[in-house]
Amino acid sequence: MIGKTIHELRMGDVAEVIHQVDAEGVAELVDAVGDYNPIHSDPDYAASTPFKEPIAPGVFTAGLISAAIGTRLPGPGAIYLSQNLKFLKPVKLGDTITARVTIVEVLRERNRIRLETVCLNQRGEEVLTGEAWVMPSRESVVYPDRYINKPPLIDTSAPVM
């Protein structure tokens, strides 16, 4: 992984990560943050809700945006400054989520970029939209991929049309 500096970033640059949502990943996040809402882990309870089955916590999907920023664009060394989010559809176990970040503004003098953020499910439906402000590293950061314990993400850093 190579973190880009403000001078390497351009309007329209895009990066994605793709992740399949599974019960183990949801359980790990629920345990890590203490979000024991039964909508995320209890099929009997979830059956009584409008969703009819467990759904992933919103922060799970939002975390994929963080992964795209921290590992792809601008990459290692970036500081995530702010994020606004809209959760549009539930994310269910088995869904494959594509988190995409697109540079929509570059403020070189302030070392800031504004990103459009979106997560899509395997049907191409938007499940999350938002906007983030990020401060790229002032120096290019090279961080070996081998330090990633469990690479759940598929790199699709090729340009998206």
Where are these regions (language model features)?
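Hot-dog-fold acyl-thioester-processing enzymes
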Residues: M1-A78, V141-M161
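Generic structural detector for well-ordered beta-strands
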Residues: E16-Q20, K86, W133-M135
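Mid-chain, well-packed structural core segment of small domains
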Residues: R72-V101
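HotDog/MaoC-like acyl-thioester-processing domains
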Residues: I2-M11, K92-M161
